[in-house]
Amino acid sequence: MHHCKRYRSPEPDPYLSYRWKRRRSYSREHEGRLRYPSRREPPPRRSRSRSHDRLPYQRRYRERRDSDTYRCEERSPSFGEDYYGPSRSRHRRRSRERGPYRTRKHAHHCHKRRTRSCSSASSRSQQSSKRSSRSVEDDKEGHLVCRIGDWLQERYEIVGNLGEGTFGKVVECLDHARGKSQVALKIIRNVGKYREAARLEINVLKKIKEKDKENKFLCVLMSDWFNFHGHMCIAFELLGKNTFEFLKENNFQPYPLPHVRHMAYQLCHALRFLHENQLTHTDLKPENILFVNSEFETLYNEHKSCEEKSVKNTSIRVADFGSATFDHEHHTTIVATRHYRPPEVILELGWAQPCDVWSIGCILFEYYRGFTLFQTHENREHLVMMEKILGPIPSHMIHRTRKQKYFYKGGLVWDENSSDGRYVKENCKPLKSYMLQDSLEHVQLFDLMRRMLEFDPAQRITLAEALLHPFFAGLTPEERSFHTSRNPSR
């Protein structure tokens, strides 16, 4: 069996006009071609686009692009990577696709509107004063035009670019009100719907900060927020790379089992805190989980005859609360990025906290193997893959769903002789067949994942139960502690 190392792209929102979806080509010309490259070939650049055709992988697996919708019905953007960027270097920028959604006031390519906020403090350099005297500009899509050396709120000095997405951009700043501490400043587009979405996220972040006064629950904390000439801005601490970016830069070599165990424990700890406070994240994925410090050492793997990066510190933080939902709030029909989306969401049966548990199960598999468990972009195929890997969908869920078009006489309608059918048959095996070793700790990990991947959310393990699973018995006392040197008031 030959499996890929995950090449995917953000899920399009079927309800929003500014997201898109290309149908896969089923032409004979491409039928039968492998979705994944040979292991002997260098790994292709990954794509997050939802197009999933049968074209050669060189075309299909393009550089990841972000199609953020920022909490509008369904959000698949990877804010974790956009908050802080792939590393702390100040020269990086990533290619993004921006949605075509724009307003009349941003019809012109670029326009000047206001005077940029500046400081009169004598300690500031003459150069900074000159830069701050420029008028504030938005580009045609409402992104704030900002440059290295600009100041915001007479406090934040921009020193680098961290990333850009449909929601806005993230810049690295020095916070002069906090001793020039480094922060990641997310600057939202000057568009009404994104402004409102940012206010919703700020509300969630305020609640988290209120409930986590001692900063023990491993969620990224907001240090400040403000409205800068129509741009909602949120300041966060500057962290390391997200866990997907590290995996990608490590040639998709999976994380060692001890690393998987420690990250899994922290994930369960953080999400249990959210769930106990009636909050569901709804968009858990490796991009939204960041290392506190992503420094690494390079080791030689004799078994694979190659060098591998090993992160020195596996402490993580959970990020991106833009689509987090309180129990009392309206629950949109579709949540979660495709590859981490549970069956109850696909079948439109309603969702709650167990939605996050399913996502964690998928994430742990990806850490362990280096590729996604469900490599698909279409509902019917996704359900078929679930059955191939996890067994049959419970009959009571089939009877309750409105999506009867996927079923006939209690079973999924699926042509195993089609191109998709052959792919699923060849690449999707029972979950335990993906186990790399049959030692006790590997068996325990797969038992935990299987309990997280129960079809019925009512039968799915809770995170309080997961923290007591035997898989975590191998943690050191230091790994079980959640001390942090961060200052919550920063």
Swiss-Prot record:
Post-translation changes: Autophosphorylates on all three types of residues.
Gene Ontology molecular function: ATP binding; identical protein binding; protein serine kinase activity; protein serine/threonine kinase activity; protein serine/threonine/tyrosine kinase activity; protein tyrosine kinase activity; RNA binding
Feature: compositional bias, Basic and acidic residues: 26-56, 63-76
Cross-referenced CDD domains: PKc_CLK3 (cd14214)
Enzyme Commission identifier(s): 2.7.12.1
Catalytic residues, chain numbering: 283 (proton acceptor)
Annotated Low complexity bias: 117-130
Catalytic reaction(s) noted: L-seryl-[protein] + ATP = O-phospho-L-seryl-[protein] + ADP + H(+); L-threonyl-[protein] + ATP = O-phospho-L-threonyl-[protein] + ADP + H(+); L-tyrosyl-[protein] + ATP = O-phospho-L-tyrosyl-[protein] + ADP + H(+)
Protein residues bound to ATP: 162-170, 186
Residue(s) carrying Phosphoserine: 9, 49, 51, 67, 76, 78, 135
Region called Disordered, residue ranges: 1-138
One protein family per Pfam: Pkinase
EC top class named in words: transferase
Regulation of its function: Leucettine L41 inhibits its kinase activity and affects the regulation of alternative splicing mediated by phosphorylation of SR proteins.
Modified sites of kind Phosphotyrosine: 7
GO biological process: protein phosphorylation; regulation of RNA splicing
Keyword line: ATP-binding, Cytoplasm, Cytoplasmic vesicle, Kinase, Nucleotide-binding, Nucleus, Phosphoprotein, Serine/threonine-protein kinase, Transferase, Tyrosine-protein kinase
Protein kinase domain residues: 156-472
Ranges in a coiled coil: none
One GO cellular component, as annotated: membrane
Tissue: Endothelial cells.
PANTHER family, per database record: DUAL SPECIFICITY PROTEIN KINASE CLK3 (PTHR45646:SF10), SERINE/THREONINE-PROTEIN KINASE DOA-RELATED (PTHR45646)
Function: Dual specificity kinase acting on both serine/threonine and tyrosine-containing substrates. Phosphorylates serine- and arginine-rich (SR) proteins of the spliceosomal complex. May be a constituent of a network of regulatory mechanisms that enable SR proteins to control RNA splicing and can cause redistribution of SR proteins from speckles to a diffuse nucleoplasmic distribution. Phosphorylates SRSF1 and SRSF3. Regulates the alternative splicing of tissue factor (F3) pre-mRNA in endothelial cells.
Name this protein carries in UniProt: Dual specificity protein kinase CLK3
